[in-house]
Amino acid sequence: MTIFIGSDVAGQRLKDVVKTFLKENNHDVVDVTEGKELDFVDSTLAVVHEVQKNDDNLGIAVDAYGAGSFIVATKVKGMIAAEVSDERSAYMTRSHNNACMITMGSEIVGDTLAKNIAKEFVNGHYDGGRHQIRVDMLNKMC
């Protein structure tokens, strides 16, 4: 599993905090916006395109509020993403929705919460079963 992470200018500092945390916990992390000053549309699309290359990939996009990146990610065919600002939602969106990407806002969550969100998201696993019906419905919309 590779975790692709990216941010716009407003999310750079928090993205770096999360990236460092994930690397310290032995995750394979690729920063697709390192050294770049992008808006949330371009930074999110950079994450989405990498995530979609392999079913095992995950993505995290950070902007000021998380909403912009969420809107962009969910416009891409086949992408199931969630805007999260708490650990439980990050975990549940993996286990129930089979989300492969989350977005969060640097103006909404602090460093510790962002680390915990990332931890729960990457440690979550899709439960399948009764949840597959909804995932199939989402995929059928594309």
UniProtKB/Swiss-Prot annotation:
GO BP annotations listed: D-allose catabolic process; galactose catabolic process; lactose catabolic process via tagatose-6-phosphate; pentose-phosphate shunt, non-oxidative branch
MF terms (GO), sorted A to Z: galactose-6-phosphate isomerase activity; ribose-5-phosphate isomerase activity
Entry keywords, A to Z: Isomerase, Lactose metabolism
Catalytic class of the enzyme: isomerase
Listed pathway(s): Carbohydrate metabolism; D-galactose 6-phosphate degradation; D-tagatose 6-phosphate from D-galactose 6-phosphate: step 1/1
EC number: 5.3.1.26
Catalytic activity, as annotated: aldehydo-D-galactose 6-phosphate = keto-D-tagatose 6-phosphate
Xref: NCBIfam families: lacA, PRK08621.1, rpiB_lacA_lacB
Quaternary data: Heteromultimeric protein consisting of LacA and LacB.
Family from the record: Belongs to the LacAB/RpiB family.
Protein name: Galactose-6-phosphate isomerase subunit LacA
